Amino acid sequence: LSIRRQRQMCIRDSPYPFKHLAGVGVALKLVLALGGESREDALFARYCTLAAIGTIADVMRMEGENRTIAFCGLEALPHTDFVGVHALLKEAGLLGKPITSVQIGFVLAPRINAAGRMGAADLAADLLETDDPARAEELAKALCDLNRERQAVEQAICADATEKIERLRAEDRSALVLSSEDWHQGVVGI
């Protein structure tokens, strides 16, 4: 059987009621299960902010458990005890402001994702793990810088692609597939 078919079979056969849980939601559920019932509320309160950021960043369906995680995480985000998340909120100009899924999707998530796209995923991981406020501030600034770099690279790719299209005759534009060896692999899919 193909891997895709095997996955479909597993999903259909699974007794779990919500089939569209984000990967970060699965990780949260694992933490809760390993922590035990007596620690479930405390663990959820601690990690729901990270799970909300991941759920929103992955553009998951906002229904069922994804919605609960996102709602609770957004509510808890301004009071997070994750030093790195706090530093990123500050560096992004969101500290003390109401946080919605829009701020996550268009402000925080792009900064976190820029690290991986630009070949420095360790910076995002370090930011989320650090307990040192000075280090968190340094990492948050680095992520914001990488995001600006990612935006510039993305704009250059778009300009190059537009130029390639404009050089084509109108009758050759019905279906387009563009590429360039010069386009950054981490950004080209955006």
What do these predicted ranges mean?
Residues 23-24, 70:
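Amphipathic alpha-helical segments in well-structured domains
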